[in-house]
């Protein structure tokens, strides 16, 4: 058996994407994502197509729950993007950025996300939240002073929403990283559609 090279692992998913699903429901899901994104997403072809439909519906449910959050859509995407950057999930970085482009959000702010702590595009409240997100994601622990600084800017509900975003983004990140799923170049597709 051949051992995969580093290049092969970077380019190919660990499981071969299923291009033609068997079930009628999954064929419909493929068609809907092709319509929504301009292509069938790799996580769908690699993971969801191999699992009972309810598992794919769970990922969809996360997106629906995000719409019930009181945080601004920009803050939601900034948090998700930041977690994806820390975890190095190329697919999640790409899809998050494509959502930001589609919503005409400030791309310069997303470009500056790695320097949020010093960049004037970010408010003190955003910096406090992103410091919290950084510690929670990277260290799996948060210092009391980091929490206190964040809680000066956010309600208890908003704090719980921030924790939800970090936890649910980990689900997406680990699912994609675990199957070697990389960028689907969704930003390019989104920019062409605008």
Model segments located where?
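Hydrophobic alpha-helical segments
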Residues: 1-194
């Amino acid at each position: 058996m051949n051992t995969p090279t580093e290049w092969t692992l970077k380019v190919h998913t660990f499981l071969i994407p299923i291009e033609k699903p068997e079930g009628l429901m999954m064929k419909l899901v493929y068609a809907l994502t092709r319509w929504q994104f301009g292509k069938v997403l790799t996580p769908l072809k690699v993971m969801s197509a191999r699992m009972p439909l309810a598992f794919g519906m769970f990922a969809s449910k996360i997106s629906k729950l995000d719409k019930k959050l009181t945080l601004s859509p920009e803050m939601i995407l900034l948090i998700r993007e930041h977690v994806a950057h820390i975890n190095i999930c190329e697919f999640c970085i790409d899809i998050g950025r494509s959502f930001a482009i589609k919503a005409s959000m400030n791309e310069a702010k997303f470009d500056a996300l790695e320097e949020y702590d010093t960049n004037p595009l970010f408010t003190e409240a955003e910096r406090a939240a992103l410091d919290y997100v950084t510690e929670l994601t990277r260290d799996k622990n948060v210092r009391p002073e980091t929490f206190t600084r964040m809680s000066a800017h956010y309600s208890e509900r908003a704090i719980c929403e921030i924790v939800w975003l970090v936890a649910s983004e980990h689900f997406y990140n680990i699912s994609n990283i675990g199957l070697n799923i990389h960028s689907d170049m969704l930003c390019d597709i989104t920019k062409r559609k605008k």
